Design a protein with these regions (language model features):
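Bacterial signal peptide processing site
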Residues: 21-23
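Long, leucine- and charge-enriched amphipathic alpha-helices
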Residues: 27-30, 104-108
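C-terminal partner/receptor-binding element of secreted or periplasmic proteins
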Residues: 105-137
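Repetitive helical segments and hydrophobic/amphipathic motifs
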Residues: 11-12
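C-terminal motif of bacterial Sec signal peptides marking the signal peptidase cleavage site
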Residues: 16-19
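Post-signal peptide N-terminal segment of mature Sec-exported envelope proteins
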Residues: 29-42
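Mature extracytoplasmic domains of secretory-pathway proteins
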Residues: 46-101
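Positively charged n-region of N-terminal signal peptides that target proteins for export
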Residues: 1-4
Length: 137
């Protein structure tokens, strides 16, 4: 009986410690220049901090897209999150300028922000692609 209990305890311990490990994938694009610096994922401090925050967070998936204003040539970032809340898929996003100033956002299940905020943020901007993606398998 002691052997059975010991075996069960070992199996339980192994299950607990290996079952808590989360499998994830990370895509980072370091071969770009934006906001006046090479590799903004590393060299723009607030963006580097945001990437680390995303890796430690609970979002099922997060992407950072690089945008460029076709008139001013300024860059901006759109960070989108996909997560579960009470069993439902939820989405949110935040738009930032190069300094890390929040300019626009949206949230699933909440009152939408005024449409003019979205229009103002995306006006004259083109997407240059995803530069960071984090997702759980």
């Amino acid at each position: 009986m002691k052997k059975v209990i010991s075996t069960l305890m070992i199996v339980f311990a192994v299950t607990v410690f290996t079952g808590c490990q989360r499998n994830y994938t990370v895509y980072e694009r370091h071969d770009i220049t934006a906001c006046g610096v090479k590799d903004p994922l590393v060299n723009v401090k607030w963006l580097a901090d945001k990437c680390e925050e995303i890796k430690k967070g609970k979002a099922k998936e997060a992407t950072i897209s690089l945008l460029k204003d076709t008139v001013t040539q300024d860059n901006a970032f759109m960070i989108r999150y996909h997560y579960k809340q009470r069993g439902k898929d939820m989405y949110s996003g935040d738009g930032y300028d190069c300094s890390g100033k929040w300019l626009y956002g949206f949230r699933s299940g909440m009152m939408p922000f005024p449409p003019e905020e979205k229009e103002k943020f995306f006006k004259n901007k083109i997407g240059l692609g995803v530069i960071f993606k984090f997702s759980f398998k």
